[in-house]
């Protein structure tokens, strides 16, 4: 437990082996991802994210923003399959995030492949979260109440196309992840980098491992004892593509992130969550998630959340 806590606090990233997911299962989800990206563009655009108020679906390269700059990657976002929530006066805007995924008609095997991976990754993440609770001298079930009944998991399949040096190598810009934990499956091509002691450190792929990093919810819950680490992805050179499958384990949208009562020796090292004036953190999970989605996908925001944009503009 000490090693887990130290890795999470000092770096915020670590490799996980012995996770229980088999190599054939890894190969299957990677094959499904490659199969999707090989589809004709028209098939992918038929499920473009802009059609989904839940921010689910396909985004072409350059279609997502990180800190206002375009990310050079194409991707498919999916979440937990649930019915939409009826809207009306007094219903929080973040309830619009709940709903169905979009799936390509041309690739019917993709849905069971990705939902199956989501289930496997969820099992791993829950075991890890319980271990983190114990490492912080908390009950094993310390977080159960805020994710148990309707967790808000999200995952992507991502392709980073190679390109010639242009002066902009942003595959995805520097950022922190917003959930509890991220479990990343990556192919053999490097590109992920973690900010550590003011420098960017490569997170090279290691076969049969997942890369785990701390999200902002754990940073909030531990009052900053555990840190969500800034990371980015650098675009591969021309002629090379990089495939990854990130899974974001989070809480119920209606949950409020608790502040853990840490033991004295840990509390003394908890300096509060890192503050970014351009990206404030909220303890209400739904508010946090919606804020992040609106910033990253302005086209979806304009189509499905124009009322919120108008209110924000009027208040500014």
Task: Annotate each language-model stretch with its function.
Residues 1-67, 72, 120-316:
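C-terminal flanking tails of non-heme Fe-dependent oxygenases
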Residues 7-10, 18-22, 72-129, 135:
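Non-heme Fe(II)/2-oxoglutarate
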């Amino acid at each position: 437990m000490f090693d887990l806590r130290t890795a999470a606090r000092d770096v915020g990233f670590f490799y996980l082996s012995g996770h229980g997911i088999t190599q054939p299962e890894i190969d299957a989800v990677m094959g499904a991802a490659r199969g999707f990206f090989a589809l004709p563009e028209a098939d992918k655009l038929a499920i473009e994210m802009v059609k989904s108020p839940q921010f689910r679906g396909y985004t072409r390269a350059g279609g997502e923003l990180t800190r206002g700059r375009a990310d050079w990657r194409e991707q498919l976002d999916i979440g937990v399959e649930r019915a939409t929530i009826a809207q009306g006066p007094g219903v929080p805007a973040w309830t619009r995030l709940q709903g169905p995924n979009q799936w390509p008609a041309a690739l019917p095997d993709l849905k069971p492949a990705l939902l199956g991976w989501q289930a496997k990754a969820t099992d791993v993440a829950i075991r890890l979260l319980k271990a983190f609770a114990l490492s912080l001298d908390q009950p094993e079930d310390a977080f159960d109440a805020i994710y148990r009944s309707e967790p808000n998991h999200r995952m992507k399949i991502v392709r980073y196309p190679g390109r010639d040096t242009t002066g902009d190598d942003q595959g995805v810009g520097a950022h922190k992840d917003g959930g509890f934990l991220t479990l990343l499956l990556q192919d053999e091509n490097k590109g992920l980098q973690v900010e550590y002691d003011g420098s960017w450190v490569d997170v090279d792929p290691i076969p049969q491992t997942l890369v785990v990093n701390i999200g902002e919810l754990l940073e909030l819950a531990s009052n900053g004892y555990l840190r969500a680490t800034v990371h980015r992805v650098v675009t591969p050179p021309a002629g090379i593509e990089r495939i990854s499958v990130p899974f974001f384990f989070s809480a119920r949208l209606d949950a409020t992130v608790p502040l853990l009562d840490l033991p004295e020796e840990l509390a003394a090292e908890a300096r509060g969550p890192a503050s970014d004036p351009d990206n404030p953190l909220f303890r209400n999970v739904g508010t946090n998630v919606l804020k992040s989605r609106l910033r990253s996908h302005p086209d979806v925001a304009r189509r499905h959340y124009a009322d919120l944009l108008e209110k924000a503009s009027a208040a500014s």
